[in-house]
Amino acid sequence: MSTNAKESAGKNIKYPWWYGGAAGIFATMVTHPLDLAKVRLQAAPMPKPTLFRMLESILANEGVVGLYSGLSAAVLRQCTYTTVRFGAYDLLKENVIPREQLTNMAYLLPCSMFSGAIGGLAGNFADVVNIRMQNDSALEAAKRRNYKNAIDGVYKIYRYEGGLKTLFTGWKPNMVRGILMTASQVVTYDVFKNYLVTKLDFDASKNYTHLTASLLAGLVATTVCSPADVMKTRIMNGSGDHQPALKILADAVRKEGPSFMFRGWLPSFTRLGPFTMLIFFAIEQLKKHRVGMPKEDK
């Protein structure tokens, strides 16, 4: 174990609350084209193209810039949703969970579920803008919203497209997804990392340990979150008629069968796998170098 790892094991270090959001922004900048293709696939009518066909179509019709449609909204989402859920989870771990129980899922799961719920609610408005901006170019010209950026999107939705009701469209499935994502992504990362270190003798300070644990966490998170993710995309991309989530679900099951809830699993994992690896890698690097922390804490 490295000197830094030994020191960390010996005392309860309180890292800055914004590490999760900063790491999320970094991961988003890299994986945004994959997320864009995933959203387009989830909203597209049948028959659906493959992930790579969708990326090829976006590149051919919209150019390289098109691959980053809605990037400002995606960054805003990380500043809200990811910052809140990671920050709240770490805060609860530091102040609520007994030190000897930091790898006990009976303690971790409730903390992660609460953190995911408030993160999903806090980031809902950014999620609505994000999904609409990503899918805008795929719509007919007359139906496009043409938001200039995330702030313009928030303003236009609030001013002209239904106000807060529209900005919080889909908040219930988004909170459910936040709960599922945080529980399946953050908790499983902690559990897998602990298992690799204590059972398989991985070095807790090494990048390969972090990347292995995060890859496994991404696999679990994609599978657990797929149904809520598909529902969230369809609700938030709606035209504003505010149909109940259960009606949208029933219509989709009737027309497409129950398997629609896992539609886009592969593109979701193709995006969420690398995203999860990058976000935890970035968090571990921020912690390793104590970025933004007072000198006496370094």
UniProtKB/Swiss-Prot annotation:
Keywords carried by this UniProt record: Antiport, Membrane, Mitochondrion, Mitochondrion inner membrane, Phosphate transport, Repeat, Transmembrane, Transmembrane helix, Transport
Task: Look up the domain of life of the source.
Answer: Eukaryota
Query: PROSITE patterns from the xrefs?
Result: SOLCAR
Name the InterPro entries on file.
Mito_Metabolite_Transporter (IPR050391), Mitochondrial_sb/sol_carrier (IPR018108), Mt_carrier_dom_sf (IPR023395)
Q: Please name the GO terms of the biological process aspect recorded for this protein, alphabetically.
A: dicarboxylic acid transport; malate transmembrane transport; oxaloacetate transport; phosphate ion transmembrane transport; succinate transmembrane transport; sulfate transmembrane transport; thiosulfate transport
Q: Where in the cell is it found?
A: Mitochondrion inner membrane
Where do the Solcar repeat units fall? 11-95, 103-195, 205-289
Q: Name one GO molecular function term.
A: oxaloacetate transmembrane transporter activity
Spell out the GO cellular component terms annotated for this protein, sorted alphabetically and separated by semicolons: mitochondrial envelope; mitochondrial inner membrane; mitochondrion
How the protein sits in the membrane?
Answer: Multi-pass membrane protein
- Which residue ranges run through the membrane? 17-37, 58-76, 105-126, 170-189, 211-231, 265-283
The subunit field of the Swiss-Prot or TrEMBL record says:
Homodimer. Binds to the TIM22 translocation complex during import.
Q: Which family does it belong to?
A: Belongs to the mitochondrial carrier (TC 2.A.29) family.
Q: What is known of its domains?
A: The C-terminal Solcar repeat is required for association with the TIM22 translocation complex during import.
What's this protein's function? Answer: Mitochondrial dicarboxylic transporter catalyzing the exchange of dicarboxylic acids like malate and succinate for inorganic phosphate. Required for growth on ethanol and acetate.
Q: Which PANTHER family match?
A: MITOCHONDRIAL DICARBOXYLATE CARRIER-RELATED
Question: What's in the misc comment field?
Answer: Present with 3390 molecules/cell in log phase SD medium.
- Protein name according to UniProt: Mitochondrial dicarboxylate transporter
Q: Which organism is it from?
A: Saccharomyces cerevisiae (strain ATCC 204508 / S288c)
